[in-house]
């Protein structure tokens, strides 16, 4: 019963990781298409007036687009999380239906993979959160403009890109990444508990085998001692 509960908890966590990763992949892919391969994260720019005699900000000019590697890394990390979560969810569901338990090697390998994904998704989450905050600070000039970052997606920035949904896309991506990270953190914790349980179980089995050998050796020792005593008499 305990094994089934443990496998069910793992299966639920894998399903959540798959779901949240899917939530990340879709908006990031859409944003890459809308921005024609340009990366919004860490983009530098400023507002310029078309006529220096006029007051107010009329046109946003990008000085340097963000590094494409930032968006690609976040998308690839989400795809890797999606595929691994799907594969492990299927395997765990198979174990749950059959009532089987994985080997110690599989549990240890699962721990390593889960820890690696936790690290990878954490980096991707940080990149997206920090990069998107820098973009919003740039177009709002750190809050000095009359419009918020979300409101600017309703304004044509004239950057030769489709910026009509960038805020919602990255808001959803941020939520999905951090939620996926929490799901993988729970998976890693369960994997560690599984490895620790298997390690303690193997120690217990070794102790039982050792005690059995000692018990089997005691009658032999008593018999030899009685034989020596009879010979002396």
Swiss-Prot record:
<comment type="similarity">
    <text>Belongs to the TMEM179 family.</text>
</comment>
<feature type="transmembrane region" description="Helical">
    <location>
        <begin position="75"/>
        <end position="95"/>
    </location>
</feature>
<feature type="transmembrane region" description="Helical">
    <location>
        <begin position="6"/>
        <end position="26"/>
    </location>
</feature>
<feature type="transmembrane region" description="Helical">
    <location>
        <begin position="104"/>
        <end position="124"/>
    </location>
</feature>
<dbReference type="GO" id="GO:0016020">
    <property type="term" value="C:membrane"/>
</dbReference>
<keyword id="KW-0472">Membrane</keyword>
<keyword id="KW-1133">Transmembrane helix</keyword>
<dbReference type="InterPro" id="IPR029673">
    <property type="entry name" value="TMEM179"/>
</dbReference>
<protein>
    <recommendedName>
        <fullName>Transmembrane protein 179</fullName>
    </recommendedName>
</protein>
<keyword id="KW-0325">Glycoprotein</keyword>
<feature type="transmembrane region" description="Helical">
    <location>
        <begin position="170"/>
        <end position="190"/>
    </location>
</feature>
<keyword id="KW-0812">Transmembrane</keyword>
<feature type="glycosylation site" description="N-linked (GlcNAc...) asparagine">
    <location>
        <position position="51"/>
    </location>
</feature>
